Amino acid sequence: MKLRIRGNSLRLRLSRSEVEAFDRDGRVEDSARFGPGARLVYALERVTAGALSATLRDGRVAVTVPSELADPWCRTDQVGLEAEQPTGDGETLRLLVEKDFTCLKTRSGEDESDAFPNPHDHC
């Protein structure tokens, strides 16, 4: 799972096997290690109700998706989910959860064997 943060925007991109695991288990998680005892954990979790939202607690980013959005996203060609979450200080956090597609140009060192086929490959 890829995590991209830019300003007040948070994006998760999931490979095919990660989408399958999320559909089956209701969660996927990954982390980035910064050294001994220091890591950033990020997770995508299915919840029964609510809205697409994110929390940050104790170095763990959790993005939650209600089943009514998660199920069709996992089981169809739907590319992504998007929401804006108020931060409580007059700002918003933009959330994106997307299926990870292969790049149109091959990049060295990039393993895309588990990525979704790019729909623009057939232009």
Label every model-predicted segment.
Residues G26-V47:
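A low-complexity, Ser/Thr/Gly/Pro-enriched, surface-exposed linker/loop concept
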Residues L3, L12-R13, V19-E20, G26-A32:
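Acidic (E/D-rich), amphipathic helical modules within compact regulatory domains
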Residues M1-L3, L52:
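Residue-level detector of beta-strand structural context in well-folded domains
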Residues G80-C123:
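C-terminal charged interaction modules
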Residues E18-A21, L69-D71:
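Short, surface-exposed beta-strand-loop junctions and turns on beta-sheet-rich folds
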Residues L3-I5, L10-L14, V61-V65:
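Short, structured motif recognition centered on aromatic/hydrophobic residues
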Residues G50-T87:
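Mid-chain, well-packed structural core segment of small domains
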Residues S9, R13, A54, R107-G109:
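A hydrophobic alpha-helical transmembrane-helix feature that marks the membrane cores
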